[in-house]
Amino acid sequence: MTCTDQKSHSQRALGTQTPALQGPQLLNTDPSSEETRPPHVNPDRLCHMEPANHFWHAGDLQAMISKEFHLAATQDDCRKGRTQEDILVPSSHPELFASVLPMAPEEAARLQQPQPLPPPSGIHLSASRTLAPTLLYSSPPSHSPFGLSSLI
């Protein structure tokens, strides 16, 4: 009884497997479905994945470029004593300098003057509290772009 039951189960399994195997075989042997499906599936997958990869790489590149630019700008400022205009001159956007160049002398003065000012103000603030209110009121105009233009 058990042998015949096993045979009937195996025959049933074969019976259920053969139509399932015939279904995909019929689809695979059909040249039109085989030619149309993979080209539609693969480009869709690539199109869905490529923009995400491009945006991700673009974000990384922007972050890296901005970090490198800021590092290079600060290194150039510290080592060569350049102003920001000297660093920004080789830019590919000359239309931006139409508004920057008239301000170049004031910007250069603003960039050169605050560099000596912050260390003494920090020293005076930590050394004596009596000079703190005057330095607090005098230091913000030196950092603001309009402060020096009004003083000069």
Swiss-Prot record:
Coiled coil stretches, renumbered: none
Tissue-by-tissue expression: Expressed in skin. Also found in heart, placenta, liver, skeletal muscle and pancreas.
Start-end of Polar residues biased regions: 1-31
Pfam families the UniProt entry points to: SEEK1
Top-rank taxon, per record: Eukaryota
UniProt-annotated stretches for the region Disordered: 1-42
Xref: InterPro entries: SEEK1
Name under which the protein is recorded: Psoriasis susceptibility 1 candidate gene 1 protein
Name of the gene encoding the protein in the UniProt record: PSORS1C1
